[in-house]
Every structure is written in structure tokens, then in C-alpha cells.
Amino acid sequence: MPASRRFTFSKEERLCSKKLIDQLFVGGNSRSLAAFPLRAVYQLIDRNPELGDNAPDLTTPVKILVSVPKKHFKRAVKRNRVKRQIREAYRKNKYILWDKLSETAGKEILLAFVWLDDELHDSAAVEAKVCNLMQRISERL
């Protein structure tokens, strides 16, 4: 791995905008992949700076959202653990998507990871599934 890669997870990489989240889940252009216990919902969007205020505020090529439903884990401690595992796995392997998007100028990805299982998994298993999903997404771009 080149030394120039930064394995950080900054605020700009988080999907926080209600408008973009609605576009991802309600809009009909998103795609979904599953690798149990995770499901990835993603949407490839154009970055158009001429739109002004209506343009998505994307300073990074990928924005992610992590969701662990209360239906699966009643205790917040367990939900937070799973979210932390997913964020860490993304942070360590985000170059899979970033390298692919550097080839396609003007494109951005909105990505949501949704937990599907009622059981906790170890970090290595979660990282393997996140990596698998990101590789499959990069192949479909």
C-alpha cells in the first residue's frame, strides 16, 4: 500500500444530510447488495457544481451511513459496537471504492450499511463482509 493513503474517517465522509438519505432510500435509483449479516444500499450520483444550493455537498467520493436497527439489538451498547466495527472496516478498506471512483470523474457514491442479524460477530468477520460488499460495488460501477 502506498504511504500516501490516509486511513481516516472524517466528518465529510459521513452521510448526514436528510435530503441525501431520502434520495438514497426513497428515490428509485439506488441498488442493494447483501452479504449476511450486512446489506449495502448504494447510489451513484453525478456531482454537478452548477446546481448551486441544490447540489449535493460532497467533498469526498464516498459518503456512508451505518444503521443497526433497534429491532435486532435492544441495548445501545451492542448497537454501538456493531456500528463501530462497520465504520472501522470501512475506514481500513475504503481505498477499494476510492480508487475506482478516481477513474470516473464527476461521480460520487452514497452508501448505507444496514445490519441484518440478531447476533454479534467478531471484527474480522465484519471486516471481511464489508470488504466483500465494497469489492462487489466497485465491480458494478
PLM regions: where:
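Positively charged, solvent-exposed patches that mediate nucleic-acid binding
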Residues: 1-141
